[in-house]
């Protein structure tokens, strides 16, 4: 693991490729997930009695952006998703519910007996096979694969893939929320900026940090990064820079 000072952030930001918001292609995985995610965000907003403008103020974005997310036109970035969930008092995983189609398989390949995804045992254990993971592709080249068959109370467990240039770059608002985060890098090199420190994690390297400390995570390299994250008390943002 290499650690560098915050003085290098401006140079790294200039080297990051620009990310553009685009409408998901009809019938694509992103389109399918966006169509499910948006209505659930809207339903949660209405339950809280918030208007579009009120939620937009909480998230620090435009009402039109919230409308596009709710209508499945675009997917939120990681900072926006955390901010939305915090404003609505929900977890990020709760937006990807069991009835949503799985990201890697068709219903015919899963079979009617739900092979690969068992019901909780008497001891509360749950099993999930790789092909039955639920996948959510966010803005800015970030893909989450949930490693639990159903949302876990107070915890989020997922494999995260960052495309080259993907993630929360130095030019983006930092993320800050309650809890603690644990990360293990499997492939590629991941840059993690926590407070005033910057870490470069290669395969096999890990990091643990307090989620209340403003942080950013991105892939400054030229190959995808695969990592595993465990977030305790995830989704309850306190604010952002």
Question: What positions do the PLM features span?
Answer:
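A short beta-strand-loop-beta hairpin characteristic of the jelly-roll/cupin
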Residues: 170-171, 176-177, 182-203
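Hydrophobic micro-packing sites on short alpha-helices
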Residues: 45, 55, 80-88, 94-96
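Ligand-binding loop in jelly-roll beta-barrel domains
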Residues: 142, 153, 202-203, 211-237
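Histidine-centered metal-chelating micro-motifs
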Residues: 168, 191, 198, 207, ...
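A short glycine-rich, His/Asp/Glu-containing loop-to-beta-strand
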Residues: 132-172, 229
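Short, charged recognition helix plus adjacent turn
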Residues: 97-143
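A short, Lys/Arg-rich alpha-helix, primarily the initiator
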Residues: 2-47
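Short alpha-helical DNA-recognition segment
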Residues: 49-67
């Amino acid at each position: 693991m290499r650690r560098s000072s915050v003085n290098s952030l401006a140079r790294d930001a200039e080297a990051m490729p620009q990310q553009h918001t685009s409408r998901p292609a009809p019938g694509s995985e992103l389109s399918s997930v966006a169509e499910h995610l948006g209505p659930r965000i809207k339903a949660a907003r209405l339950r809280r009695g918030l208007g579009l403008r009120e939620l937009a103020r909480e998230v620090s974005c435009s009402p039109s952006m919230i409308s596009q997310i709710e209508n499945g036109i675009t997917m939120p970035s990681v900072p926006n998703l955390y901010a939305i969930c915090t404003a609505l008092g929900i977890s990020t995983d709760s937006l990807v519910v069991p009835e949503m189609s799985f990201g890697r398989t068709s219903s015919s390949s899963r079979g009617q007996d739900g092979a690969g995804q068992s019901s909780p045992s008497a001891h509360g254990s749950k099993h999930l096979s790789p092909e039955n993971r639920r996948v959510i592709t966010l803005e800015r080249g970030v893909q989450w694969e949930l490693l639990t068959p159903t949302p876990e109370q107070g915890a989020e467990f997922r494999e995260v893939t960052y495309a080259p240039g993907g993630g929360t770059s130095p030019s983006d608002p930092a993320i800050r929320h309650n809890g603690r985060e644990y990360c293990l890098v499997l492939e590629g090199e991941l840059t993690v900026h926590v407070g005033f420190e910057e870490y470069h994690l290669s395969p096999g390297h890990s990091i643990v940090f307090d989620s209340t400390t403003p942080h950013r995570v991105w892939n400054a390299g030229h190959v995808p990064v695969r990592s595993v994250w465990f977030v305790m008390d995830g989704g309850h943002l306190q604010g952002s820079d």
